[in-house]
Each structure stands twice: as structure tokens, then as C-alpha cells.
């Protein structure tokens, strides 16, 4: 069972860190400044998954902006979607004796060794966006992020509305574009969607083909082209993020079909480009996954540094959007 389902609270004692060290080679750089009074600023080491999507870019910028606003020193690294890069970055942060380590894990498993090293160094770890599986739940303090399983459920439920609005009758043949293999969002979004499908639509809905598009537009385009060759009668696409859906739209149009009509599309994230596609009638519904976690993360980091008790899982607030809401919502999208 994934640890994001554990709702226990945990108190963490944090030892005072020594002087600040220079940024490691793999860090993109440090930002932030001490906020007066001679008090030592908080130093946060943050390891990001990568820059594979518009969502991730917005997430990274939110972290950087919020750290600057809070006056923290931020050591930021981009793992380029490789677990070994994240482990290396975390070890670098341990060596630099940062106050708190935060990271968005590339995959769910394989973190115990480096997390034990952080615990031994008395540096608390905060997960952002994604969960991990560990043998010891004390290896991290909290998760700040979305309920991906519920996002999958919400996607299935909003598909019910999309099908009704489209007047669809008959079998629902679904193509699923999965996120990165082994990543928490991919595992949990698929799980939540299937829960609703099996409970309410066992006889009329079927996932006829499912494959990873690695959360990228290029991946979505390539995999959707293959889907249409092997299963030309697909009438629904469930994409684990907007970028893959946008890539898939190119392949759908290249095949002479109309996205949003011949193939109904539901995706997850809510990035601005997704709303543009939805306002053009090419995506039917979007389940929001909020990337702007920076302010919440900085608040949690301060509490953890001060030894306060925090919730085991701090969820983000999110909404769902149908196609007819896109034009009105688009000007207010911040990412």
C-alpha cells in the first residue's frame, strides 16, 4: 500500500544545522536571502523530477518563487527523470547539511537507503507531489500533494458526464495514455479510474489499449498514433496528463478524426495549453491537479524546521472542468 494513504500525524525533532555550504555541481543554483535580525535563514534542498511537462515547469517555478518570497536559501536540482540523479542530489544536500530536504520522487520505490542517510544526519525529508513506498514510515515527515487515486476516480466520473453530453450510445472503447512507468501519478490515476469503471461500468466500458506516454507531448503523439493503427475503433481517450493529450490530438487529427467528437478526451492537470485545447473543442473535460505547491511547501518546511507537528499528508485543493467552462476559466489560469 502506498504511504500517501497513511493519515497519521508525526512530530519531528530537527537538529540545528551548521554553516551553509556551497552548492553542489548538480544543483542549478541557490536563491533566497536571510530575512533580517541576524537570524539564520532556512536552507532547503529540493530535487525536482524534471521538466517533462507544462505542469512540471509551473511546479518548479512555484517552488522557486515561494522560497524567494519566504527568504529561504533554495538549492534546486533537476533530475531529468532519472532516479539516480535524485539520489545523488539528496546525498549532496546531506553533505551540505541543509535544514530540510524536499523532493518529488521519479518513481515509488528504491528510496530507503538514501532516506536512511538523511535520517541519520537528522535532516527531515518532505515529499512533494508524489509518494514513495518505504520499509520505515519515519523516513519522511509528510507529503504535500494531490490525491492521485481520487483524480483517477474524478476522471471516470467526469467521463460519465462527457458521454451523456455527447449523447453517446453503445460500447465505450477507451485508450489510456499512462504516465511514467512506476511513478505514483501513473499507478494511482489508473487505479482510481478502474475502480469507478469496474464498480459502475463493467459491462459497457473497456480499456482496449493502455501504454505509457511518459507524461510528454512527444510520447502522447507517438503512442496515440500506434493506438489508432492497432485499435481504429477507439472512441474515448483517458490521458494521465494534458501534455500527452495534446500530443495525442495531433495523431488523432492526422488520422482524419476529430478530437473531442470522434474520440472524446478526458485528461488530468489543467495547464493553460490544455484549457486552450478544451476551448477549441478538442478536449472534453479536465481534472485539475494543482502544481502551485510552493507556498504550502514553504509553510511546511518552516514548521518542520521549528519542530512543529504536521499532518502526514497535506492535500491540495483542486477542481474539475467541462468543455463549456473552458473559455471563461482560461484567462485566470496561472500555469
Predicted regions and their residues:
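Hydrophobic alpha-helical segments within soluble ligand-binding/sensing domains
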Residues: 44, 86, 143-172, 219-221, ...
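N-terminal secretory signal peptides and thylakoid transit peptides that target proteins
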Residues: 1-15
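Hydrophobic alpha-helical
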Residues: 103-120, 193, 209-276
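Short beta-strand elements at the ligand-binding edges of bilobed clamshell
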Residues: 76-78, 134-161, 176, 210, ...
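Flexible loop/hinge segments that line or gate small-molecule binding clefts
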Residues: 109, 113-150, 173, 271-277, ...
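Hinge/cleft segment of the Venus flytrap/periplasmic-binding protein
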Residues: 40-42, 177-185, 196, 200, ...
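Bacterial lipoprotein signal-peptidase II cleavage site
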Residues: 21-34
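Extracytoplasmic "Venus flytrap"
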Residues: 43-62, 66, 75-88, 92, ...
